Amino acid sequence: MIKKYLVLILCFSFQQLESAEKSEILLAMDKYNEAFILADYDQIIENFIFPVSIITSDRMLSIDTKFGLRFVYKKIRGDLPEFYSYSKWNNIDIQVMDKNIAIVSASFSRYDKNEKKFYDGSGIYQLKKIDKVWKIFSLIPFQSIETL
């Protein structure tokens, strides 16, 4: 009988821990998105841990400095059309690999100043928990995915 209660308590504790981790990761993703919307480069950088890896279909970047990451994000953000207003997460799937590493698969939409969606995209974000805070260390943005 005691074993059953112990198992129930352990399962409940694990679910609470899992839920807390998910909330912390979602908070990190939301902080990153908000900084991106505001073009707040200092805050964008605060969401990362170095070195940062950004992999696109065209190139692979390894960024070791805040200056380098700021440069990349000014380019990314600067290439958006003038009518860009905000981005919104559509779906976020989280896999925690161990207690300090997570892989986040997220889809998002970008909207103009009239609330009209003009772009759908996705990304794979790898995060590491440092001093109890989840930070991004790798990003793979893409527009579509094909299952083989």
Language model: regions and residue ranges:
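Short, low-complexity N-terminal intrinsically disordered segments enriched in polar/charged residues
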Residues: 8, 12-46
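Hydrophobic pocket/interface hotspot
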Residues: 32, 44-45, 52, 69, ...
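Beta-strand elements of well-folded, non-transmembrane domains
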Residues: 37, 110-112, 129
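A mature extracytoplasmic/lumenal domain signature
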Residues: 48, 58, 106-108, 125, ...
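A short gly/proline-enriched turn/hairpin at secondary-structure junctions
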Residues: 53-64, 81
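Surface-exposed, charged secondary-structure patches
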Residues: 67-113
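Short beta-strand edge/turn micro-motifs at domain boundaries
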Residues: 120-147
